[in-house]
A protein has these predicted regions:
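Oxidoreductase cofactor-interface core, primarily capturing Rossmann-like NAD(P)-dependent enzymes
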Residues: 2-14, 24-34, 41-54, 61-70, ...
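A hydrophobic C-terminal alpha-helical subdomain
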Residues: 172, 207-269
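Cofactor-binding loops of NAD(P)H-dependent oxidoreductases
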Residues: 21
Length: 269
């Protein structure tokens, strides 16, 4: 077993073979990929100082140079193209613009997987906050009645990735495979949670008001606007979702099931 890390000296115990691999140091990637059949490539937009396009381009080139047979790239919808330039969501569009690099690289097989809006966000950056009226809930620039959130348990994305590697005949020719456990409006999310014993509230605020809440909120306001206008995936993706579930060999966890375990009542008080 081979483990990849940016600092192999600190992690020698991880595997029989521990190799340095740093997306910001392309010279480390060939040794990391050498001898592998496939590569699952993910970049992190939020990492300070990272350049996703540069990182992914270098990784794709290295994978091609050492003869990788199947590259699976973790992408997101191209908000710029879908919205005709109306919305600017770099952490979506930046990944989508790498799709062309993957397609043109000439791998025997390549696949695109699409991570959902994480259920885990509801105990992270989207966790309910105390509101001015004393309730716990959300104040977002989003119509809560619009069904637009394609969501899932991010821990299940690996089922789709593994399935793509196992079934290149079905999912190795540029197919897009989204992990979607549920497709809900924010009202439906709150109804689900409150039906489990919570008393969460929701207030719709303007994009301008939300943008002033905290650093980085302006981009999130753009994202919410895009979701409301076009949904998270941006198009009718029922066929892609069905194929992803078939490739994974299972149905993804529904939001209500996840929330019952992961958003206990004690977190609401």
């Amino acid at each position: 077993m081979r483990a990849l890390t940016r600092d192999p000296d600190k992690h020698r115990e991880l595997a029989e073979e521990v190799i340095e691999a740093d997306l910001d140091q392309p010279e480390t990637l060939k040794a990391a990929f050498e001898g592998a059949h496939g590569v699952f490539l993910v970049t992190n937009f939020r990492e300070k100082g990272s350049d996703e396009f540069k990182q992914a381009t270098a990784a794709v080139r290295a994978a091609k140079d050492v003869g990788i047979q199947h590259l699976v790239w973790s992408t997101l919808p191209n908000v710029e193209a879908i919205s005709g330039g109306k919305f600017d969501v770099p952490h979506f569009t930046g990944k989508a613009k790498i799709d062309r690099i993957v397609k043109e690289a000439g791998f025997p097989h390549h696949t695109f997987v699409i991570a959902p809006g994480y259920y885990q966000n509801f105990v992270g950056f989207l966790a309910p906050q105390k509101q001015a009226d004393g309730s716990m809930g959300w104040a977002l620039p989003l119509d809560p009645g619009v069904r637009c959130l394609h969501m899932g348990d991010i821990r299940e994305l690996g089922d789709i990735v593994a399935g793509a590697f196992a079934h290149p005949d079905q999912a190795g020719h540029g197919e897009y495979l989204p992990l979607i456990g549920d497709f809900l409006s924010f009202n439906e999310i709150i109804e689900t949670l409150n039906g489990q014993g919570h008393t969460f509230s929701f207030k719709q605020v303007s994009k301008e008001v939300f943008a002033a809440f905290f650093p980085g909120a302006a981009e999130l306001a753009e994202m919410f606007g895009y979701w409301e206008a076009h949904t998270y995936l941006g198009s009718d993706s029922s066929d892609r979702i069905a194929l992803a579930n078939k490739i994974a060999g299972r149905q993804p966890t529904r939001f209500s099931t996840w929330a019952r375990v992961n958003v206990p009542i004690k977190e609401a008080v």
